Amino acid sequence: MAENVQDIKRRIKSVNSTMQITHAMELVASAKLRKSRELAEGRRPYFEAMIESIGRIVEKSGNARNIFMDQREVKKTAYIIITGDKGLAGGYNVNVAKLVEEHITDKENAVLFTVGSRGRDHFRNREYHIQGEYLGISERPNFFNAKEVTAIVMEGFKNGEYDEVYIAYTKFVSTITQHAQMMKLLPLSAEELITSGKVKTTEETKEEKSKMSDRELTIMTYEPEPEELLKYLIPNFVSSTVYGSMIESAASEQGARRTAMESATTNANEMIDGLTLQYNRVRQAAITQEISEIVGGAEALN
């Protein structure tokens, strides 16, 4: 019986140590989540201004085109896949990988660029063609990371190595809700650029636009020519889109990890309560047995 008591005490100690770790990881994830959300909010005005400018140029010029807007027959498809470098984040990594596998209809004609070791390992084990891998940047991405990935992918599209590009990432909704998303990155659609440029603006931007008359917007001219402007703006737009997806994914990963660690901490606490109750019962039973033996021995002497 005494041995059983010691065993329960060891289990309580072990679970308590685990609970301290999961609680610490929960706090760290909360801090990282806050930073990721600040990054996301900081980039939004720049991105909205850029997409509005591109949409306006395409709409007003009428015939302004760019190689990254060319629609062609799809033979090969490239995927930028954003996952984490670590686990312990619930279904965060698995959901993105599953979404990509569902989207790929022809494994032989899919080219992958993986951000994060979890995605890299998943698709490498399934013998997909991984053309590029980017590790150690998933938790704290910066714009230069996004430009590095984007430059290689856009060069491949430009050279005809693949005919369309998708990006798979996780959209951050709230701390407890994240959704795996698949978004077409290239080729860009003129119609979608025009529409996005009109609707993806903040209230502050809308107020500024309202001060300009339709005539002022119509007679606006661009220097240099629209095609030259698009050569500069579109690569930055695509890089900003990739960067935004990285930030969304980083926030989603920390949100998923915080939720998972919070759940683990709660479960560990409940387990400790159960083990403590069990320990008290076993200890009480042992004490009762000892008392009974003493009483029985005393009666035997009498």
UniProtKB/Swiss-Prot annotation:
Inhibited by nitrate. Pfam families: ATP-synt. Keywords: ATP synthesis, Cell membrane, CF(1), Hydrogen ion transport, Ion transport, Membrane, Transport. GO terms for molecular function: ATP binding; proton-transporting ATP synthase activity, rotational mechanism. One of its GO terms (cellular component) is plasma membrane. It comes from the Bacteria. Its main location: membrane. It is found in: Cell membrane. InterPro entries: ATP_synth_F1_ATPase_gsu (IPR035968), ATP_synth_F1_gsu (IPR000131), ATP_synth_F1_gsu_CS (IPR023632). It is a peripheral membrane protein. GO terms for biological process: proton motive force-driven plasma membrane ATP synthesis. Disulfide bonds: none annotated. Transmembrane segments: none annotated. Belongs to the ATPase gamma chain family. Produces ATP from ADP in the presence of a proton gradient across the membrane. The gamma chain is believed to be important in regulating ATPase activity and the flow of protons through the CF(0) complex. F-type ATPases have 2 components, CF(1) - the catalytic core - and CF(0) - the membrane proton channel. CF(1) has five subunits: alpha(3), beta(3), gamma(1), delta(1), epsilon(1). CF(0) has three main subunits: a, b and c. This is ATP synthase gamma chain, sodium ion specific. The lineage of its organism: Bacteria, Bacillati, Bacillota, Clostridia, Eubacteriales.
